[in-house]
Amino acid sequence: RPERCGSAMRKAEAEKCARRNGRFNASKCRCTSAGKPSRNSEPSKGSKPRPEKPSKGSKPRPEKPSKGSKPKPEKPSKGSKPRPERCGSAMRKAEAEKCARRNGRFNASKCRCTSAGKPSRKSEPSKGSKPRPEKPSKESKPRPEKPSKGSKPRPEKPSKGSKPRPEGCGSAMR
């Protein structure tokens, strides 16, 4: 092939390749159509079915993601719109109080209570809150409870070390 493929041969092959809607590779002196190299011996038979199959196969691929991608952004948009509307100043206080009972953190901007890193579902506060304090207690041991053991170097030593600072300077000291 490289021996046969001179400048005149390349032009002729490139023109044939363009008719088949293919790409001509000058270095390999080959015409590739739809990512597959076309056989020069059977240009009429091989080139016709090849562009048709990719056209059929390529149509459902872009359509399916377009169908699947449409409901995905819509669902969060439906869920996210009512949250800021519901969450007024009174609502935030009530949610923050509920969240404090669960030993969770209340995010005012999102109007959500997160306990042990997981957002609590507002729809099931009574059912969902009972097992959650149990699980967070296990999960949160590394955070608030283990800090009692593991925080000896961090908050407890400061508590011992802080006695001379705020506690040492008490009413007796004054």
From Swiss-Prot:
This is Balbiani ring protein 1. Used by the larvae to construct a supramolecular structure, the larval tube. It comes from the Eukaryota. Residues 42-85, 124-167 are annotated as: 4 X 11 AA tandem repeats. Residues 28-174 are annotated as: Disordered. Changing G57E: In clone PCT21. Its main location: secreted. Keywords: Repeat, Secreted. Sequence repeats lie at residues 42-52, 53-63, 64-74, 75-85, 124-134, 135-145, 146-156, 157-167. GO terms for cellular component: extracellular region. Salivary gland. Residues 49-100, 121-159 have a biased composition (Basic and acidic residues). It is found in: Secreted.
